[in-house]
């Protein structure tokens, strides 16, 4: 592709607070490319009422190099693409669409790779025999898939809707060809956490609009590692409690940064500077 200029976008609902545009624009500029990253918010007048297919077609005809896809379109976009990576196809969700010079679209999931890279970076020697993930919705499917394809032997996914947790488990087990994921009821999850090596919060609990924790943190001990996908605030109540109890922790910034790093590489073919993108993210 032509690296003199880069045109990217994010399709989703209520995306005004996303830090992804700033990371891509700053990294592109640092690499010598005039980079524009547009928010395509389907709740705004400009995009409201337009189908996902129409938005993809418009991006192609306008000369976009790529798109990030977020809630609620990560699943809906799959059948609209020319090709999808094996990983994204197995997961059934795409968050990154590369648009070739010929207009062909290819879908990828950098939520999966981003979480894995963040985990390797932040907790490189964490024990992964048994892990509990709290939350089966939203980004939970990508986190669960990432965990069991990057070292976790047995994953228990807990949700207030046990059927949703089991559906996620069944889908991932089918995709990876082994019984590694088990759905459980989030009520009483503390017993499962107490017996596990680590726990990941994949619920909105801990966000500014949802203060608190998704489970009783008194079940944690110093042998646990604790991860959180929430990054606003970076220091969630869960991570505060976990550190006070002697646990090693992984905050949500790592996944957020590395999903953007991996997407930038796919969009441009350029090698991004992780620390530079991290600095941009943390400056916002």
Curated annotation (Swiss-Prot):
Catalytic reactions of this protein: L-quinate + NAD(+) = 3-dehydroquinate + NADH + H(+); shikimate + NAD(+) = 3-dehydroshikimate + NADH + H(+)
Self-association and partners: Homodimer.
CDD domains, A to Z: NAD_bind_Shikimate_DH
Purpose of the protein: Involved in the biosynthesis of the chorismate, which leads to the biosynthesis of aromatic amino acids, and plays a key role in the quinate degradation pathway. Catalyzes the NAD(+)-dependent oxidation of both quinate and shikimate to 3-dehydroquinate and 3-dehydroshikimate, respectively. It can only use NAD.
Domain of life: Bacteria
Binding site for L-quinate: 18-20, 70, 74, 95, 111, 259
Protein known as: Quinate/shikimate dehydrogenase (NAD(+))
Binding site for shikimate: 18, 70, 74, 95, 111, 259
Keywords: Amino-acid biosynthesis, Aromatic amino acid biosynthesis, NAD, Oxidoreductase
InterPro entries: Aminoacid_DH-like_N_sf (IPR046346), NAD(P)-bd_dom_sf (IPR036291), Sacchrp_dh_NADP-bd (IPR005097), SDH_C (IPR041121), Shikimate_DH-bd_N (IPR013708), Shikimate_DH_fam (IPR022893)
Residue sites binding NAD(+) per the record: 137-138, 159, 164, 203-206, 214, 229, 252
HAMAP family reported in the protein's UniProt record: Shikimate_DH_AroE
Stretches of the chain forming a coiled coil according to its record: none
Residues of the active site: 73
Matches recorded under Pfam families: Sacchrp_dh_NADP (PF03435), SDH_C (PF18317), Shikimate_dh_N (PF08501)
Listed GO MF terms: NAD+ binding; NADP binding; quinate 3-dehydrogenase (NAD+) activity; shikimate 3-dehydrogenase (NAD+) activity; shikimate 3-dehydrogenase (NADP+) activity
GO terms classed as biological process: amino acid biosynthetic process; aromatic amino acid family biosynthetic process; chorismate biosynthetic process; shikimate metabolic process
Pathway: Metabolic intermediate biosynthesis; chorismate biosynthesis; chorismate from D-erythrose 4-phosphate and phosphoenolpyruvate: step 4/7; Aromatic compound metabolism; 3,4-dihydroxybenzoate biosynthesis; 3-dehydroquinate from D-quinate (NAD(+) route)
Top EC class for this record: oxidoreductase
Family to which this protein belongs: Belongs to the shikimate dehydrogenase family.
Translocase listed as a keyword: no
Biological classification of the source: Bacteria, Bacillati, Actinomycetota, Actinomycetes, Mycobacteriales
GO annotation, cellular component aspect: cytosol
